[in-house]
A protein has these predicted regions:
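Enzymes that bind and transform nitrogen-containing heteroaromatic metabolites
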Residues: 3, 7-15, 21-234
Length: 234
């Protein structure tokens, strides 16, 4: 009973004990692990049933997080649309230099938080006037401080975060040990070695550097498979 309760409230337990929310990365990809063509085209790799399941995970999450690259490429909204919901999750964009266009669809409807490393007062004011909240967390490399952002989301009361991002942000979050679970939607297709991968992890020189996973669940949605896995902690 206790284990079942902890599983149902894993995000809350993690936030109370670690000061971090449960971070779950959702990635749609081909069977050879590719998430988009070399030119960025990715709509749609998976079918409608898999996408609807993805909206269920959006609906249960406190926040949906992405990078500015995904917003610029797809004009992403990050809202729950394909399933019934009583609330919309907080939408979070990591945008180190505040490149967000002021006519981006994600600015519609409010409930949007932008994390940036920029201290440009005019840019911040413009984004805030367009309806978003802006928080500055800069790392030493001039990019957004990922751990500080995730800790801030925990401080805002977020228990579960769904990440829907590209290979660079997916890789950075994994490398910093911030990802707890993966939702991998596999489509029965091959996109080739020039297509973009699921996570940019750089070169590993030893198997000791690998990120190990534990299987949680495998299900089929239409013609696609969903693999639910957790990241093993060393």
């Amino acid at each position: 009973m206790e284990a079942s309760a902890q599983a149902l409230n894993a995000g809350f337990v993690m936030r109370m004990t670690r000061g971090l929310p449960l971070l779950r990365s959702k990635i749609a990809m081909s069977l050879d692990g590719r998430t988009a063509l070399h030119n960025g085209a990715s709509q749609w790799i998976t079918g409608g049933a898999a996408r609807r399941d993805g909206h269920h995970w959006r609906a249960r999450s406190c926040a949906v997080l992405t990078g500015i690259g995904t917003v610029l490429a797809d004009d992403a909204q990050l809202s729950v649309r394909e399933v019934a919901t009583t609330r919309q999750p907080l939408r979070v964009v990591l945008d180190s230099t505040l490149k967000l266009p002021l006519d981006a669809r994600i600015l519609q409807g409010g409930n949007l938080l932008i994390y940036t490393a920029s201290r440009d007062v005019q840019k911040i004011a413009a984004v805030e006037n367009a309806g978003a909240q802006v928080a500055v967390f800069a790392a030493a490399n001039g990019k957004v401080d990922l751990r500080a952002c995730v800790q801030d989301l925990a401080a805002r009361g977020c228990n579960e975060i769904l990440v829907e991002a590209g290979q660079r942000l997916n890789g950075a979050l994994l490398q910093q040990g911030l990802v707890d679970e993966l939702l991998l939607y596999l489509a029965p297709q091959l996109l080739g070695d020039m297509a973009r991968g699921m996570a940019q992890l750089g070169e590993l020189t030893s198997l000791e550097q690998r990120i190990e996973l534990a299987w949680q669940d495998v299900r089929q949605f239409g013609g696609d498979l969903r693999i639910h896995a957790s990241v093993k902690r060393r």
